[in-house]
Amino acid sequence: MCGIVGVASNAPVNQLIYDALLLLQHRGQDAAGIVTQIDRKFHMHKAKGMVKDVFRTRNMRSLPGNCGLGQVRYPTAGNAFSEEEAQPFYVNAPFGLVLVHNGNLTNAKALKAELFSTDHRHINTESDSEVLLNVLAHELEKTTRGLPLTPADVFKAVQGVHRRVKGSYAVIALIAGHGLLAFRDPFGIRPLCIGKGKDGTYMLASESVALEGTMHQFERNIAPGEAVFIDMSTTLHSQQCADAPSLNPCIFEYVYLARPDSTLDGISVYQARLNLGETLAKRVISTVPPSDIDVVIPIPESSRPSAAQLAQLLGLPYREGFVKNRYVGRTFIMPGQAVRKKSVRQKLNVIASEFKGRNVLLVDDSIVRGTTSREIVQMAREAGARKVYMASAAPPVRYPNVYGIDMPTKDELVAHNKSVDEIRQIIDCDALIYQDVDAMKLAVANAVLPGFPKVHGFDASCFDGIYVTGDVSAEDIERLNENRPSQQDESEADSDRSRLALPNAS
């Protein structure tokens, strides 16, 4: 999972891109990068770390130009600690291309071999985003054949990308001297929207909050399979480039990943989480009598709307029992299980008075590996709770995700091939209540805002095992596991600077 942004303007864009990336920081904390363009020349800075740490004043001054793009990275393939795999990625032909990508390709290995043997292109990293960039570059080269580039050529190239690439991808690319290109996979698994400023500036971003927070008016979502091209005069061109597009956004965006003040594909993330709390309340009643619960406490922060709604419906007190250290990243998206476990107590501290002598119902947005949940239950008991009940606003995560969330291996999922009671014993809580899959889908779908069409399908593969692209086999999942983020020790990774430094690593 990553956050991406692109800006086309008649004024410098470096500060705009920086501000938008800050608003998308929750989508990735591993690395950040920005590219701008002036006089057909790209200027790039990228490195490991948070946005505020990667970009200093001197870096911002070296990013001139009225067009650019950026990314905050959360690795789902390749090496989690490699600075070389920070985005944007660059290739010099045709024209000069830079690209940022949110998602995960399910056929990256086959494409990489095809690029080498047939297209005669070299891939220097383990990142599927570099593969995607080279596919786009080849399709553009094949389409233009040395002739001037037109919007029709761009859309024809994207059609070629859709034919070759499988999986999830929201993409923003900059074509030197020509303009800004954005497109989504034919299933719209990863979000992408566009907005416009009062001065005519266009901004593309993963979430609407990046538009609103930088004073851009939300215009619309990029449709599944659609491509948008903004030329150097900031004229917008768009075309549907997929044969049979079908909107199936990732439901985990609404459960956990997106900011609550965002709207994705017309669905309010905040309202979706309220709805999830409402349906979860019904599940709680069937498992634990509300009279046996003294207080409802959320696990900060994504679960707060669901927990508050649940408490209100059950007529129970809602209290903040955990204080979050905001300077520690989101534990779910930290690379490496050992790093996640260590960070739980660094991230959360209990307010003991809310637990002592009480039966507490803890509400979390989801339970993936169980590492965080077990630590939190133990913290509640140490604070004096008599009984600790755990409720998840999402159903059990039983299946690997192959579309860009860092949970691909079955062995890492606490719910895989286990009953709810077996999971309860692992987490060590007194009762465990999960959301229902169908209820979750309905709750999220019913959060659509007025004026937007209802979403009829979701990618909920980590919950129901149904892969919406229809081309993912057990063998594919095993192959993808081989290329998931390396979990090598970070100190070891920091000392490994031996790889050849090419433009993609600058």
Predicted regions and their residues:
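Secondary-structure transition/capping motifs at alpha-helix termini
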Residues: 121, 142, 286-292, 312-321, ...
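PRPP-dependent phosphoribosyltransferase catalytic core
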Residues: 162, 177-179, 184, 200, ...
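Extended, hydrophobic alpha-helical segments in both membrane/secreted and soluble proteins
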Residues: 296-299, 303-310, 314, 318, ...
